[in-house]
C-alpha cells in the first residue's frame, strides 16, 4: 500500500476548503447581495401615492418620504411612520405610473 504524501493531503484539504467557500459564496452571499441591491433600488424609486406593503403586512399608500422613514396612509384618518427598510413590496395588482419624459 502506498501512503499519501503530507503535501498531497494538505493540497487536497486546501482545494476542498476553497470549493466549500465558493459554494457558500455562490449559494448564499451573492444572492443576498443581489437582493439587498434590488431592495435599495426599490426604496429609491418610491414616490408619493405608491401603494406598498410593509414587512409586518400593513398595506398603505405613501404620503411622505423622509431620509430614513416613510409615512403611509393606512385608513381615511390614519397615518403610520415606518423605517424605509420595512417597506418590502408594491401591493399586488398595483401598477406604478411612469412619469413622462419630454
UniProtKB/Swiss-Prot annotation:
Encoding gene, per UniProt annotation: yajC
Superkingdom of the source species: Bacteria
Protein name in UniProt: Sec translocon accessory complex subunit YajC
PANTHER family from the UniProt entry: SEC TRANSLOCON ACCESSORY COMPLEX SUBUNIT YAJC
Species this protein is from: Aquifex aeolicus (strain VF5)
Disulphide connectivity of cysteines: none
Record key words, sorted: Cell inner membrane, Cell membrane, Membrane, Protein transport, Translocation, Transmembrane, Transmembrane helix, Transport
Record's bilayer topology term: Single-pass membrane protein
Keyword set includes Cell inner membrane: yes
Amino acid at each position: 500500500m502506498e501512503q499519501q504524501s503530507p503535501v498531497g493531503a494538505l493540497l487536497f484539504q486546501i482545494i476542498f476548503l476553497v470549493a466549500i467557500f465558493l459554494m457558500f459564496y455562490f449559494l448564499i452571499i451573492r444572492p443576498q447581495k443581489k437582493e439587498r441591491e434590488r431592495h435599495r433600488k426599490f426604496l429609491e424609486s418610491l414616490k408619493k401615492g405608491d401603494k406598498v406593503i410593509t414587512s409586518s403586512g400593513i398595506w398603505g399608500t405613501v404620503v411622505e418620504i423622509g431620509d430614513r422613514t416613510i409615512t403611509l396612509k393606512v385608513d381615511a384618518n390614519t397615518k403610520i411612520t415606518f423605517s424605509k427598510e420595512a417597506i418590502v413590496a408594491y401591493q399586488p395588482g398595483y401598477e406604478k405610473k411612469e412619469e413622462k419624459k419630454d
